[in-house]
């Protein structure tokens, strides 16, 4: 199931095969459009190896010493950005896509084999790997504070170990951008704020998902045409200044 527990401000996004079409929440308004057109989705890019090497070597250690232990990990932050009083949660939708498509391709296995640090039986285990745990998360756009759980992972230890890096990468970046956007929108006192950050973003992925996060933070539009197409958000522009 995929219960939306709004009064608890928590989503259960587990059981990857049971997750329905993703939805966006902008300024409290939920849209019926899918998170992205299928051929533009990040699902087209397998992100399973978006992890630190030590996560995989630790997984092999657990594999060599079998355990059925289920662990609980909470993702939280210690200090508000820019010494502000709050932050804004963002990144959940990409986390959902990442979990849904979590698997090792033959190319992934071949690459890991080439590193010559993983045993054949462990690599064979990875061929059939999929996430079976539970994930609970605060909805995007929610005001959040230090040291409160934003995402809770309940899963077998190897599965929880693997997803740590990507989960934090997605959550931290997009929540930071959404928070900054929210502070700018608040300072504007009702004037509309547009997001024009693409040319200064740290690469295409940061530009695309940063623009989406800025919309969650309250911006009324973005200059990023690809973000507009992917997520059906307003695109806006002025003219050259040179």
PLM segments and residue spans:
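Short, positively charged and aromatic/hydrophobic N-terminal segments
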Residues: 2-7, 11-12, 18-21, 25-27, ...
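Ordered alpha/beta subdomains of enzyme catalytic regions
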Residues: 26, 32-242
């Amino acid at each position: 199931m995929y219960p939306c527990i709004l009064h608890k401000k928590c989503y259960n996004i587990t059981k990857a095969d049971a997750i329905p079409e993703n939805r966006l929440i902008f300024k409290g308004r939920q849209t019926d459009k899918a998170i992205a057109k299928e051929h533009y989705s990040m699902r087209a890019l397998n992100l399973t190896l978006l992890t630190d090497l030590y996560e995989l070597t630790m997984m092999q250690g657990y594999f060599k010493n079998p355990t059925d232990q289920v662990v609980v990990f909470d993702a939280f932050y210690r200090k508000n950005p820019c010494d502000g009083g709050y932050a804004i949660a963002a990144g959940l939708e990409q986390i959902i896509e990442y979990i849904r498509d979590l698997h090792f391709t033959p190319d992934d296995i071949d690459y890991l084999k080439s590193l010559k640090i993983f045993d054949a039986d462990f690599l064979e285990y990875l061929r059939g790997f999929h996430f079976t745990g539970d994930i609970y998360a605060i909805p995007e756009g929610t005001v959040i504070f230090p040291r409160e759980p934003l995402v809770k992972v309940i899963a077998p230890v190897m599965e929880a170990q693997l997803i740590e890096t990507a989960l934090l990468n997605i959550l931290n970046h997009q929540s930071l951008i959404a928070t900054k956007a929210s502070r700018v929108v608040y300072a504007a006192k009702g004037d509309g704020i547009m997001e024009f950050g693409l040319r200064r973003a740290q690469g295409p992925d940061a530009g695309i998902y940063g623009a989406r996060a800025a919309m969650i933070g309250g911006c009324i539009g973005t200059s990023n045409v690809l973000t507009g197409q992917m997520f059906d958000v307003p695109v806006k522009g002025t003219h050259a200044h040179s």
